[in-house]
Amino acid sequence: MVSIAVSGCAQIGAPTGGPRDSIPPVLITASPKLFTTNFKGNKITLIFNEYINVLDVQKNVLVSPFPKTSPVIDFKLKTVSIKLIDTLIDNTTYAINFGNAIVDNNENNPFKEFTYVFSTGSTIDSLKLSGKVLMAETGKPDSTLQALLYRNANDSSVEKRKPDYIAKIDANGKFTFTNLSEGIYRIYALKDGDGGKTYNSKIESFAFADADIIVAAIPDSVLLYAYEEEKEKKKIPSVAVKSAADKKLKFTPAPSKNLQQDLSSNFELHFNNTLKNFDTTKIVLTDTSNNKIEGITISLDSTRKIVSIKNKWPVNTYYRLIIAKDAVSDSANNLLAKSDTFHFKSKSESDYGSLTLRFTKIDLAKHPVIQFLAASEIVRSVAVTGSNWSDKLFIPGEYELRILYDANNNGIWDPGNYEKKLQPEKAITLDKKLTIRADWDNERDIDL
């Protein structure tokens, strides 16, 4: 795809009244004609049967092979004119793919998937290469990526020069290169962050094939898995100067909703400031008779803003958490305004649903992990070690299910590394979501 200069005349107004025009424009004449061989000129003219527009040329029009200098596309009334600026390569088939960019002036009916093809040699190359790109972490397609194809390439070509061919990736992750000559190619996929058409940032989504691709008379298909080697760092918004009230050390208990403690989670205190000092002896968990609960673990997380109380929570049990005023202090030596006591209870079994998953055709040798996602965030991951898995106390809600093939068996998804030629770990997102109902036996058969 190239950055294409484009100009056009003022739009011709559509007539009012009558039935809606649903007929796309028709190509009447192409000069030189479509599939011309031994092409020598630098101008192409397309004449249609009605007034047309060319929409979003930069996005919709692909020129292959990729020229060094962009052609100029001009449209006026019923005519599209293309001026080729770049020197054409001998014995090469060129394709100018307009996609759905050419539309009629009245109702924007597209002249669908139109490609103007010509050759500077005596034949038109007609080989194709199709494939699919999926995001490795999710197993889902991403149509914002593009497929890149190189001739006469080495490992560094994708980092140093623009590709010879580019293909769009559709909503299903599929792509097709057309009008190729027989030969050896290298294929990649890229979400191009800076428009340079090269892989130059580890935060760009990228995919590569393990070996060269041979394009021959018998068509082949390629499957690529894209990844970001490094996650883009989120921009931290500027912080307004705190008022005196905001500077006070405060915290919020979690869970805060009705103070119902999940049986498998820690009770947490979320502080507004980073803690400097932290005294576990001044944070006490008791029962309702004021008997101290032994065997708990109190810890501070790496951000030094979350205090966690870990305990084996029996069902439907009431607790008190007593926090002394000087139990914690922040970097400005602020203490809590006062000592505080929280009353809460652990949940009952009826607050949960029972879940049983039965797996068919799952490859345990690939170390599968079942991931439960809520609002696109992984809330639980469980290694699959057999054909059945169950949990009697599963938090109700709607979950997206994902199977991660954890190659290095570390429990998390790992990206690829192009320099080391390491492919990313792969995952599959299941089509059907899982709904867990409280106080209910929930079951799902998963056929992979």
Pin down the residues of each PLM region:
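Structured interaction patches on ligand/partner-binding surfaces of diverse proteins
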Residues: K112-E113, D192-E232, A337-D340, S348-S350, ...
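Beta-strand C-termini and the immediately following turn/loop, strongest in propeller blades
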Residues: T360-I362, Y405
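Short S/T/G/P-rich N-terminal loop/turn motif that feeds into the first structured element of a domain
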Residues: L364-K366
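Acidic, low-complexity Ser/Thr/Gly/Pro-rich repeat segments typical of extracellular/periplasmic
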Residues: G8-N172, T176-L190, K202-A217, E232-S354, ...
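Sec-dependent bacterial lipoprotein signal peptides
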Residues: M1-C9
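Short loop/turn motifs at secondary-structure boundaries
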Residues: S354-R358, D414
